[in-house]
Amino acid sequence: MAERAALEELVKLQGERVRGLKQQKASAELIEEEVAKLLKLKAQLGPDESKQKFVLKTPKGTRDYSPRQMAVREKVFDVIIRCFKRHGAEVIDTPVFELKETLMGKYGEDSKLIYDLKDQGGELLSLRYDLTVPFARYLAMNKLTNIKRYHIAKVYRRDNPAMTRGRYREFYQCDFDIAGNFDPMIPDAECLKIMCEILSSLQIGDFLVKVNDRRILDGMFAICGVSDSKFRTICSSVDKLDKVSWEEVKNEMVGEKGLAPEVADRIGDYVQQHGGVSLVEQLLQDPKLSQNKQALEGLGDLKLLFEYLTLFGIDDKISFDLSLARGLDYYTGVIYEAVLLQTPAQAGEEPLGVGSVAAGGRYDGLVGMFDPKGRKVPCVGLSIGVERIFSIVEQRLEALEEKIRTTETQVLVASAQKKLLEERLKLVSELWDAGIKAELLYKKNPKLLNQLQYCEEAGIPLVAIIGEQELKDGVIKLRSVTSREEVDVRREDLVEEIKRRTGQPLCIC
């Protein structure tokens, strides 16, 4: 390293000598001789390997977002936040990293995907895996027993994501949760209603919400002959049924997880069933499942849930699916997952799911894990998979070649003649002070045509044009970019006229 630094210094000095000789207009022979020395030194130096090897890119599983992409995101977030607020939720925020012990033991087999951090102070830290566990920690720390909250923030998972399908290592989650002791299934039904409202409002296609109950799963495993120690690992296998065939799931359970083939077959008889409230009624009459206390409680709650979903008018969007397992360890009751459906090729075929876009469930024991006295706070919630939704919306807009505005500018302050920069600056300041979203070009004497073209490219609807005659008459020429219609507006009336044309309230109360 020291030798390289010395050579670099010699190259620098020789380069300065060559430049000096050229400025002094020295003889061509002398300059040529010194240039040869410079080239020889550069050859000795060789290429800078550190610069050659460095590739400018974002880390694996992350990406930058262009103004166009961010405009799409803001619209999606706006739909989600308005829905959360409509249902009476407060907003909170928590640190992006937590103590490692806060996160460990909460995610089952997915714990291996948690990002660990190195901290000079000696604390063992991890990036948050989701927003649910930090929320439970927040409740326990603040001794809260009743809250309805939403939280939109980034989470981190150390897996191998398929970025083309909207899966990343760093991504946003939009969570809504209800904490507190309430009568059964009322908060759960509201969470499902919120999920359906958001997915319908976003207009991303037909969807289906699968529901199940962790107690039904555990009861089913018990009567099929699965040992308690294997409940969670078998659960994670069953959860793959939406992606792979039953045969593949069975092979994993038998070959990799040591389950007896006859036990796997008994599980298969159950987990391949799905339907509505009629399936709940059918299973309540099942001679084996109905004898299991846990399963019976879960089925009873699901029957009640379907009653409330019918009252909310969303029962046609819900399917009771015994294969839904949700791999996270902290779920204790009802679980659900929304999937987008792609239209079947042939009439009469089953709709085909093309990806999960929202999920959630009940987790009554999670807060108690953090409370010193183990006090439980029942919770139920949902999480919207916005990255998947962003990908779908972006693809749709690209296919339609639809133009998206990336700014909210309402008016461009323009000039028709030269030497009117001061007047433009005064006017744009007046508009900003009045709450108008306004811009001007950063040139002293821009051409009017260039100013109008900028408006068309940026989607700015109005142009306020200042000219020498307008200044004498005390008016501003207001031009519609799309219709090209121009009207003279008195300067004192300009703010109200812009607000009227752009649909902005005339006063801020």
From Swiss-Prot:
GO biological process per UniProt: histidyl-tRNA aminoacylation; mitochondrial translation; translation; tRNA aminoacylation for protein translation
SUPFAM superfamilies to which the protein is assigned, alphabetical: Class II aaRS ABD-related (SSF52954), Class II aaRS and biotin synthetases (SSF55681), S15/NS1 RNA-binding domain (SSF47060)
Pfam families the UniProt entry points to: HGTP_anticodon, tRNA-synt_His, WHEP-TRS
Organs and tissues of expression: Brain, heart, liver and kidney.
Residues the record lists as N-acetylalanine modifications: 2
Modified residues (Phosphoserine): 66, 356
Positions that bind L-histidine: 130-132, 157, 173, 177, 326, 330-331
A GO term, aspect molecular function: histidine-tRNA ligase activity
Keyword ATP-binding: yes
Annotated catalysed reactions: tRNA(His) + L-histidine + ATP = L-histidyl-tRNA(His) + AMP + diphosphate + H(+)
EC numbers on record: 6.1.1.21
Location(s), subcellular: Cytoplasm
Mutagenesis / variant outcome for changing residue 238 to A: In CMT2W; uncertain significance
GO cellular component: cytoplasm; cytosol; mitochondrion
Boundaries of every WHEP-TRS domain copy: 3-59
InterPro entries tied to this protein: aa-tRNA-synth_II, aa-tRNA-synth_II/BPL/LPL, Anticodon-bd, Anticodon-bd_dom_sf, His-tRNA-ligase, HisRS-like_core, HisRS/HisZ, HisRS_anticodon
Domain of life: Eukaryota
Family: Belongs to the class-II aminoacyl-tRNA synthetase family.
Function per UniProt: Catalyzes the ATP-dependent ligation of histidine to the 3'-end of its cognate tRNA, via the formation of an aminoacyl-adenylate intermediate (His-AMP). Plays a role in axon guidance.
Record's subunit section: Homodimer.
Associated disorder: Usher syndrome 3B: A syndrome characterized by progressive vision and hearing loss during early childhood. Some patients have the so-called 'Charles Bonnet syndrome,' involving decreased visual acuity and vivid visual hallucinations. USH is a genetically heterogeneous condition characterized by the association of retinitis pigmentosa with sensorineural deafness. Age at onset and differences in auditory and vestibular function distinguish Usher syndrome type 1 (USH1), Usher syndrome type 2 (USH2) and Usher syndrome type 3 (USH3).
Name this polypeptide is given: Histidine--tRNA ligase, cytoplasmic
Provenance organism: Homo sapiens (Human)
Higher taxonomy: Eukaryota, Metazoa, Chordata, Craniata, Vertebrata
